[in-house]
Amino acid sequence: MSSSADNSNNSSSRFPAAVDSINNNSNSINDASQFHNSYNEVNEINNDTNSQVNNGNNITFHVLVSLKEAAKIIGPQGNTIETIRRENDIKIGISPREKSCSDRLLNVSGPPRQVANSLGQVLRVLTTDYEPEEHVFKHLRFMLPPASKEEIEDPEKWKQIGNLRLICTNPQISSVIGQQGAKIKKLIETHTVKLVASKHFLPDSKDRVLEIQGFPTSVANCINEIAELFIQDDVHVPPRTLPRYYPHSKHTKEIQVSQTLAIPKEFVGALLGVGGNRIANLRKFTKTKIVIGQDPTENGDRIFTVWGNDQKSVKLAQTMLLKNLEVEKKRREEHEASLKDGSSVPAAAAASAATSISASGANQNDSIHTPVSDNESPVVFTE
């Protein structure tokens, strides 16, 4: 296999250095970013009989997968995962699906070479007929951007590049990085893959995500060498006292329910308010997350997506947005009418419009009014 250094003239990609374990040495990060990646495709598994990983040691890898990815790995009637198990003579399984949980764990145990090979097969399954996903659970979102067209000119080859999210303990992450990032640089160069480790722990655990991107066979060879590093550094068996990550519903309480609203682009500014103050207050009051699409639709609308812990919160935010929109429309209509009549909008009409948007039919005395500028309609939040 030729190294990425031999093919650096064919690629402009730089390796990510988002690994906080080497952040205390800025020079090592800068060095890491100088390596180039050509995503060399490897057709054969590297079977090194002299490697320590083939001396009777077993290893277990945990992979974070989405519900959709888990379904692909299992396959119809469980045929896909059974084939991987049979061909590699390993233990492989997926954690039970938890209610209101968006992720599952793929667990693979056995001799390191077979485990690495099976994970290469898993990646090949995931890249077949791949469709991008939008993930609410932030740890499911890939840290590495997709390979660029400059890196892989052949569209069919480009489709074969995929990502795996290995779940590793902090000592395991340190083992992969090595002194001054030397080991992770070598892994990247040798196997022409991309590697990045998350800066933060997974919820309720001391585990982090180690993401690997590349061709399935290249990723398999990289994982095999990672297994060897774990065994050499004696970090392949995590301490029993270490909190390990597992999917459970409380992890996904952050955001579960979503609704979209189409807002005419000419009203977006009024709904956001000066400096985004109005939408910020609405988010805080309803305990929701509101994301505004950047590009208008064919109808000239901007899409507001509301995320929340429950349907009630999302519905409240949706109702308040729509009422704010109605008030703004009415305010503009009255303003236009006043210009035609040569008179100003009566203050009583504006006050009446303000009280009409109190959520859940609350009394006016129970309302919290946000500051209103000359160009904004009033917004009322009920307690």
UniProtKB/Swiss-Prot annotation:
Biased composition (Low complexity): 343-362
Domain KH: 58-122, 161-226, 256-321
Entries under InterPro entries matching the protein: KH_dom, KH_dom_type_1, KH_dom_type_1_sf
GO biological process: chromatin organization; mRNA transport; regulation of translation
UniProt subcellular location: Cytoplasm; Cytoplasm, P-body; Nucleus; Chromosome, Telomere
Stretches the record annotates as Disordered: 332-383
Gene3D superfamilies for the chain: K Homology domain, type 1
Primary role: RNA-binding protein involved in the correct localization of transcripts in the cell. RNA localization is a widespread mechanism for achieving localized protein synthesis. Involved in structural and functional organization of telomeric chromatin and regulates silencing at the HMR locus.
Similarity remark: Belongs to the HEK2 family.
Record's subunit section: Binds RNA.
Name of this protein: Heterogeneous nuclear rnp K-like protein 2
